[in-house]
Amino acid sequence: MNARFLIVPFLAAAVSCAGVHFSESDGLPPIRPDYIGVTIPEGIAPLQMEMADGRECSYTSERIGDTLYFTVSAWQKGSREGIRYAPFPVYVSHDPIDPYLAYRLIEPGYESWREMGLYSRELASYKEKAIVTNSAVGGACVNCHNFPGGDPSRMMFHVRGAGGGTVFAKDGMLRLLNLTTVGPHRQGVYPAWHPSGRYIAFASNSIQQSFPISGTQQVEVYDHWSDIILYDVGTDSVTVYPPLFEASRNETFPTWSPDGSSLFFCCADSVADVAADRVRVRYRLQRIDFRDGSFVGDPHTVWESDSISVSHPRVSGKWLLFTASRYGTFPIWHREADLWLLDLETGEARPAAELNSEESESFHNWSSGGRWLVFSSRRLDGRYTRLFLAHFDGEGHFSKPFLLPQKAMSHNDLRLKSYNVPEFVRSAPGQYDAQVRKLYGR
């Protein structure tokens, strides 16, 4: 990314301020999205912004070394007087970032939806393409997408409902498997593809909902029971390992270590009435060894707290990021849910204050190089999850997060869907609607 590339989109905006006299201000502009002082990857789509108070604005940029300096001028529509604010920096990092994101778009409801789908977004532009939409499966739910190591030549996703199952894509070819017809006859969610590509760990759970009649939380989602199952892609077989299939414990959110030698997951002691005792249910982070296609030994606790429930662990090198909430296993509906960073070498964990807000932070994933993070947050309005990116220095510190760039802020205001389960992908994923229709005989 260079200054010339950035300035071109802004020149047209500057024309509209002709004839306006600007007084200089030492203050920084109240813009949205808040890009002041963020770190962006080289080559990302141009940052577009507007005044948070609705005033007209124009802006220019100048690059000095690896810093972009934006100067914003603002005025009331029809006025001949305006303010030119002090320049603010945007830092450019040369740390590589995977060129695509994959995510699900869905209305933030409880039971119903109209349209949903899995989509990819090119980070160097604003281009978004459908991987598969639920129109290809008669309006059923499509979810739980996963790519092995961000490799778009292989992926999987679930289709819920009558005739549903798990769809596997490999080199552009699709096949359908119903996990409940093999092994222990259990469905699977929250997939985690082993680095070798041979195995997929799933949580197999009974998901329930309750609707509190007091307080501000609209819905509570919880597991009545949950276990870990292992699918062998090579043999189409599903196995269970007794220590991960205990009725006295609920295991969920599997994720592999980078070398595939162990599986991290979240575990809580079972309670008889989860709906009534949900505030007592707190998940701890556990780990179990994995060798030659099998789990080995008993799991051990990596981190736990009597006041925090752990969910969505993701590992990069010696660092593990998880979502922390007061209780439970579905933090997206918990306003207090924050991201925490755990040093696996020291066992010390801290809130990732650089990333967190007053609203819920939940799903997150590392880039393949471990220097970038994508996560979902409801910080803009408390209802819809949007995607934010942040740089990681490799020493335990994140930069200020920034909203995924769009052509205009109105895109975020008018798109009444939530971004769900973001994942970095190393190149453009396929588009499978036509093949999925054929697979389902539509």
What are these regions (language model features)?
Residues I7-S16:
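Bacterial N-terminal signal peptides
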Residues C17-R442:
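Sequence signature of WD/YWTD-type beta-propeller architectures
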Residues M1-L6:
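Bacterial N-terminal signal peptides that target proteins for export
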